[in-house]
């Protein structure tokens, strides 16, 4: 793998780090969390000015870059514990529209994502799914010139911030999964917002006889599972990169604490934290290099292994950082507790490290 960053990539990373360092002090982040939806419209606008919402999108709509640039952005957002829905909008939402949308849908929606005008969120997982992507009981009944959606979705991350939802449902006519573009204020849509462990916005979504025009269906009917798998795989890689950013920041905070308190006897434990962070970064790079591979089996195997390893490193580093800080580490007034909470949430996203180990084993057995 060649991960020597180009001048443009280094400039992107450095400018974003300066922005996050200046805008996302712990005090400001706490203030953002205290707002109704736990976000900063100003920060969203500043990220748009940086051009990061164009990453991975086609050049025809002003897009540039790809997985490697997204990795750099996710690392920096992780370092600052940035709350804005970059992953939901760019990696998941933008990826689904890019890969599965019609020409007209791509032309209409992708430019709005690129400028930050549109925040789009995937509403897919349901009760009892256990991270299985084709476990969908929501139904889309096709009528004359319309669809009627019925069902419910749980833990829809960033839903309270969304301008548009991408909702999955089983197409009664086509037989497979279809995706639908649904405005949150559509009659029959009910959202119940709440906060996750790390303070981020999420919601459960109920669809009660939601009537949509046929044009609201994203792409072709009944064949959305492949696009969902690809988008989620890219999200695996992006979350690995975010975890690396969180881990590196947590190590820096821990080193400062050890030096300030002159806790030299803990140096061995800290060196192990640094070593494991380096290994996690290597696995993040591997995930980034394979997240859009055409060979589905190879892609899923590598991404499962990468996420499992990074998740275990995240758990270890978080535990060690908390122990080395002592009781003060549990306080919401110090940064370490917020970094540890974010690592826990990343590890639980789309399947925790134990689930990914099982998935990796299943893939190996299937190939043997």
Label the predicted regions.
Residues 1-81, 100-103, 112, 116, ...:
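Alpha-helical interface subdomain recognition
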Residues 66, 132-134, 158-162:
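Short glycine/proline-enriched turns and hinge-like loops at secondary-structure junctions
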Residues 84-104:
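N-terminal glycine-rich flavin-associated loop
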Residues 99-101, 141, 167-170, 181-184, ...:
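Short beta-strand-to-turn element immediately C-terminal to the catalytic PLP-Schiff-base lysine
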Residues 116-127:
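A short, Trp-centered hydrophobic/proline-enriched beta-strand micro-motif
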Residues 131, 135, 155-156, 183-221:
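Flexible, small-/acidic-enriched active-site or ligand-binding loops
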Residues 132-150:
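Cytochrome P450 C-terminal beta-domain/meander region
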Residues 146, 150-189:
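A short core secondary-structure module
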């Amino acid at each position: 793998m060649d991960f020597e960053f180009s001048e443009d990539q280094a400039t992107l990373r450095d400018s974003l780090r300066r922005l996050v360092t200046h805008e996302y002090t712990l005090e400001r982040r706490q203030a953002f969390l205290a707002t109704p939806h736990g976000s900063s419209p100003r920060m969203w606008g500043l990220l748009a000015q940086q051009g990061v919402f164009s990453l991975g999108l086609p050049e025809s709509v002003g897009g540039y870059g790809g997985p490697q640039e997204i990795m750099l952005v996710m690392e920096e957002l992780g370092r600052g514990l940035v709350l804005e829905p970059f992953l939901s909008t760019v990696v998941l939402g933008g990826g689904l529209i890019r890969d599965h949308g019609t020409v007209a849908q791509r032309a209409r929606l992708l430019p709005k994502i690129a400028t930050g005008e549109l925040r789009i969120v995937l509403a897919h997982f349901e009760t009892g799914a256990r991270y299985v992507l084709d476990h969908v009981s929501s139904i889309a009944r096709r009528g004359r010139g319309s669809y009627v959606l019925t069902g419910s979705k749980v833990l829809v991350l960033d839903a309270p911030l969304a301008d548009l939802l991408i909702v999955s449902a089983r197409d009664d006519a086509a037989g497979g999964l279809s995706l639908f573009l649904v405005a949150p204020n559509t009659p029959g849509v009910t959202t119940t917002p709440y906060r996750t462990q790390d303070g981020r916005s999420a919601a459960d979504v109920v669809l009660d006889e939601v009537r949509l025009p046929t044009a609201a269906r994203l792409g072709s009917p009944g064949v959305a599972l492949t696009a969902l798998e690809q988008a989620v795989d890219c999200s695996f890689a992006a979350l690995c990169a975010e975890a690396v950013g969180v881990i590196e920041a947590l190590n820096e905070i821990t080193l400062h604490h050890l030096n300030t308190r002159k806790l030299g006897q803990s140096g061995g434990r800290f060196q192990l934290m640094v070593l494991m962070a380096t290994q996690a970064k290597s696995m993040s790079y591997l995930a980034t290099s394979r997240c859009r591979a055409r060979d589905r089996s190879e892609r899923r195997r590598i991404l499962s292994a990468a996420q499992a390893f990074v998740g275990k490193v995240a758990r270890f580093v978080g535990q060690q950082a908390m122990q080395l800080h002592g009781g003060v580490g549990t306080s919401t007034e110090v940064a370490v507790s917020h970094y540890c909470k974010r690592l826990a949430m990343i590890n639980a996203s789309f399947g925790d490290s134990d689930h990914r180990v099982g998935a990796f084993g299943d893939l190996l057995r299937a190939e043997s």
